[in-house]
Amino acid sequence: MVRTKANYVPGAYRKVVASQAPRKVLGSSTFVTNSSGSSRKAENKYAGGNPVCVRPTPKWQKGIGEFFRLSPKDSKKENQIPEEAGSSGLGKAKRKACPLQPDHRDDENE
C-alpha cells in the first residue's frame, strides 16, 4: 500500500531509529592504572580460544613433512592402475553412442 497525503495522519507514522551502544568515555576518573595485580591473574587464567591437549605421537603415525616429500611414484595408492583411477576417460576405449528408440506405447493408449 502506498502512503499519500490524503491518508497521512500527523504523528501516526514515525521513522524508526536504530539505537546505538553506549560509548566509552575517555579520561574517566574511575579507570584504574594499577595493573600489577591483574597481570598475575592473566598468567594463571585461561584466556580463551581452542584448548589443546598435547599428546605423544604414536609410532605408526608419519609426520606431515614425509607426506609432502613423497614423490607420486613412491607413494602407495589404492588405485595403482592409472586407467582405473579417476573418471577422465584417458586411456580407455571410446564407447559408441546408442540413441534410444522412441517409445510409441504412450501414443497407442491415448
Swiss-Prot record:
Residue numbers covered by motif PIP-box: 61-71
Crosslink feature (Glycyl lysine isopeptide (Lys-Gly) (interchain with G-Cter in ubiquitin)) location: 15, 24
Ranges of biased composition (kind: Low complexity): 29-39
InterPro entries per the UniProt record, alphabetical: PCNA-AF, PCNA-AF_dom
Domain of life: Eukaryota
Motif (KEN box): 77-79
Motif residue range(s): D-box: 23-34
Record's comment on post-translational modification: Monoubiquitinated at Lys-15 and Lys-24 during normal S phase, promoting its association with PCNA. Also diubiquitinated at these 2 sites. Following DNA damage, monoubiquitin chains at Lys-15 and Lys-24 are probably extended, leading to disrupt the interaction with PCNA. Polyubiquitinated by the APC/C complex at the mitotic exit, leading to its degradation by the proteasome.
Residue ranges annotated as motif Initiation motif: 84-96
Acyltransferase as UniProt keyword: no
Modified sites of kind Phosphoserine: 28, 71
Notes on the domains: The PIP-box mediates the interaction with PCNA.
Protein name per the record: PCNA-associated factor
Organism field: Rattus norvegicus (Rat)
